[in-house]
Curated annotation (Swiss-Prot):
Lineage: Bacteria, Pseudomonadati, Thermodesulfobacteriota, Desulfobulbia, Desulfobulbales
Family: Belongs to the universal ribosomal protein uL1 family.
Subunit structure: Part of the 50S ribosomal subunit.
GO terms classed as biological process: regulation of translation; translation
GO MF annotation terms: rRNA binding; structural constituent of ribosome; tRNA binding
Protein name: Large ribosomal subunit protein uL1
């Protein structure tokens, strides 16, 4: 965890940390309390009324943010033949099969996302123990095991964010950069929240969207009113 000093303390006192705000107000406070000398990531943390220990309440998916993430994502694609050519043309950073498997087995991991055509999963399985713990394994639920490689590469490059609910129903993601400004960050946050609400399991009872907090990498968390968000998404 980053070390926090006087700047964090001073900034966190510029708003009421116990109050909940509209999304636009909360983003404004995050921008006002950002003090780092680098372009901080805009983070969102959501507490959901689900129990991920139950398979039917495990939420794992992805969303393409309207303004991207601000990060350069290196995409590796396992494909052959025409699909290999398609992946290269679509802008994949690395494309191959057994050659990439051998390279990864040797310790090379200079990529951020992986995609595989279904016929390559037998090959990819050889390095499952390497990719799996690092959340780099192609996954059909996330759309990264597909023959439509060009579409997926485009989505990843344009700002596709994968997410998964963790213990205690907590879900978090980086959904932009502070330099984006209020309008773009608000739009990204709303798109992310809309996706989460769409994924509500039928077995989830009671309040689903319990709390939402946004922050910059080094800044204090700002609470967003979940009631306001639910009403906003329904409009």
């Amino acid at each position: 965890m980053p070390k926090r000093g006087k700047n964090y303390s001073n900034k966190s006192q510029s708003f009421d940390k116990q109050q909940v705000y509209t999304l636009e107000e909360a983003v404004g406070h995050v921008l006002a309390t950002s003090y780092a000398k680098f372009d901080e990531t805009f983070d969102i943390a959501i507490k959901l009324g689900v129990d991920p220990r139950h398979a039917d309440q495990m939420i794992r998916s992805s969303v393409v943010l309207p303004h991207g993430t601000g990060k350069v994502t290196r995409v590796l694609v396992f494909a052959k033949g025409a699909k290999e050519a398609e992946a290269r043309e679509a802008g994949a950073d690395f494309v191959g099969g057994d050659d990439l498997v051998e390279k990864i087995q040797g310790g090379w991991l200079e990529f951020d996302k992986t995609v595989a055509t279904p016929d390559m999963m037998g090959t990819v399985g050889k390095i499952g123990r390497v990719l799996g713990p690092r959340n780099l394994m192609p996954n059909a639920k996330l759309g990264t095991v597909t023959f439509d490689v060009a579409k997926v590469i485009e989505e990843i490059k344009s700002g596709k964010v994968d997410f998964k609910v963790e213990k205690a129903g907590i879900l978090h993601a980086g959904i932009g950069k502070i330099s984006f400004g209020n309008e773009k960050l608000t739009a990204n946050a709303l798109a992310f929240i809309e996706k989460i609400i769409q994924l509500k399991p039928s077995s989830s009872k009671g309040v689903y969207l319990k709390s939402v907090t946004i922050s910059s990498t080094m800044g204090p968390g700002v609470k967003v009113d979940p009631v306001y968000l639910r009403a906003l998404v329904k409009k």
